[in-house]
Amino acid sequence: KNSSIANTMSATYMALAAFFPANLPRNEGTFRSVSLVMPEGSAVNPRPPAPMTMNTVFIAHQIIHAIWQALGSARPDLACAGWGRAIHPISAGHDGARDHDFIMYHWHGMPGAGAVEGRDGFGQIGHLNALGGLTIPNLEDYEQLYPVRYIRQELRCDGGGPGKWRGGTGIEYTVETDNPAVFYFRSEGLGPPSGYGAHDGHAGA
């Protein structure tokens, strides 16, 4: 993945703001003192026609984590442990009962947030770039809007990293549909867990 200059800057500022004291404004005056080195042709400043699909979600996640890990080594008391990466699918098909096509984003299949000093991480919090600002949909609403039925939805057992403060965990769920549907999966959330430990904590599963 590649990141546009605007996305690289916003991800950097967001990562830095997490270390600011509460009384320090999050505005242009504060960030004006920050100098970003973004080599042209790199992943953080690509040349056209480099693809940048969903750069606000996936490579932004890596940028934020890189900054958090660097600053966390200097100030572990302010460090936030890593957040999980999303792998929620998209379902598309035809709703026979309502006779129209549908596209359903599985926003409820979200990862957990890392812990910080003094607080456990939140479970099923959403994408890191939203810092918990994404509203997780209600399953009953989804069952009314789409031709699906949820069999179960539960917090994943021991998904959060152990430590003095426990990391948040993601979701395991089972859903079935009454109609033929195509499922698309984002693969960025596969592979080694991204929920690294901080301040002597351990990584999530």
PLM regions with names:
Residues 1-205:
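Glycine/proline-enriched, intrinsically flexible loops and inter-domain linkers
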